[in-house]
């Protein structure tokens, strides 16, 4: 089991049963991976889900995350402020570092700064790369 932080856009892309990335969402419910979240991340998930779907669907998805035994709730005590171009993205980085996460899954290039820093064991990957990793470990 790996600890993973999933940015909001990647969460949205992985939820639909018709999504090519659905295996990522499923991996948080079958115990393949642990989804690491903070209250701030959950609030952003809910805000965006409310915009893209409706209140009932957003609540259902958030409740599924919160009640999932493979979700780890992280309390961040230090703000690393590594992303200057979009400071709101720092909540995902801070969560990943605090949680000792293996991956941040994102399509956002603001996170490239993490690739330039030497964080042992933390990789920033896109959906396609993470899906390939999942398919490899499920063989």
Segments from the language model and where they lie:
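Acidic, PIN/NYN-like endoribonuclease modules and their adjacent C-terminal/linker elements
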Residues: 90, 109-139
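Extended, non-globular alpha-helical segments
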Residues: 39-66, 126, 133-139
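Alpha-helix capping/helix-boundary segments
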Residues: 10-11, 41, 110-111
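Active-site neighborhoods of divalent-metal-dependent phosphate/nucleic-acid chemistry enzymes
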Residues: 70-104, 109, 113
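A secondary-structure boundary/capping signal
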Residues: 7-8, 37-38, 107, 126-127
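Metal-dependent nucleic-acid phosphoesterase active-site entry motif
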Residues: 1-18
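Conserved beta-strand segments of alpha/beta enzyme cores
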Residues: 34, 70-72, 123
């Amino acid at each position: 089991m790996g600890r993973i932080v999933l940015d909001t856009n990647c969460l949205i892309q992985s939820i639909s049963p018709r999504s090519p990335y659905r295996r990522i969402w499923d991996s948080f419910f079958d115990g393949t991976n642990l989804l690491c979240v903070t209250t701030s991340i959950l609030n952003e998930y809910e805000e965006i889900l409310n915009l893209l779907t409706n209140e009932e669907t957003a609540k259902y998805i958030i409740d599924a995350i919160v009640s999932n035994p493979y979700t780890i709730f992280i309390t961040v005590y230090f703000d690393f402020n590594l992303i200057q171009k979009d400071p709101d993205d720092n909540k995902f980085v801070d969560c990943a570092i605090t949680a000792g996460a293996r991956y941040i899954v994102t399509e956002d290039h603001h996170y490239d700064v993490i690739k330039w820093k030497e964080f042992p064991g933390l990789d920033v990957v896109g959906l396609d790369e993470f899906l390939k990793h999942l398919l490899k470990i499920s063989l």
